[in-house]
Amino acid sequence: MGRSKKSRKPGALGAPEPMVTRNRSESDVEGRERKRVKKRKGLKSGSRHSDGSEAKQRKAALARDPRLGSKKKIPLIVEPAKKLTKQERKLSNEQELEMLENDAQLNTLLDRIENGENLGAGLQKFVDEKLDRIEHLMGRLGLLEPEDDEEEIFEEAPVASKKKASSDEDLLSQFEDFDLDSFKG
């Protein structure tokens, strides 16, 4: 029977360590392997020459412009920008009005004004501009309700302004559709 040797590997505490039995040929193979590994410790020969070229290659790879060789397709024909129709402009006005009505900052400032606080000049100007814009958008969309007192005094004026408002929209659409390139010499 061969020699039996205890293993040095830590096991469970108090548990008996198993006995490791090895053949003579296994021990020889392990010994040769350890000797080969021990011989090959250290750096490879000629490393000071080969490391420089690898570092240069790495620097070259990093310095290369990533935009070179792009596969992104570029359109050769530029399509003219599509002009918004009246209906699309009206839709965008509705969206802008909704955004202004749901503006949290404007709502808090209006609440402060209702509570009797005096706002600074800048904040008051901001509130006035936003309220004017809301009133303008409501007028363009036809959501603005005329006041009764002013309607009795000036009966003819709102009728004329309504016609003017519709003609203003017509003039605006006519201006946007007008091609200025035809006047270039």
Swiss-Prot record:
Highest taxon listed in the record's lineage: Bacteria
Region (Disordered): 1-74, 145-169
Basic residues: compositionally biased ranges: 34-47
Biased composition range(s): Acidic residues: 145-155
Family: Belongs to the YihI family.
UniProt-listed NCBIfam families: PRK05244.1-1
Self-association and partners: Interacts with Der.
Protein name (Swiss-Prot/TrEMBL): Der GTPase-activating protein YihI
Organism, as annotated: Vibrio atlanticus (strain LGP32) (Vibrio splendidus (strain Mel32))
Gene: yihI
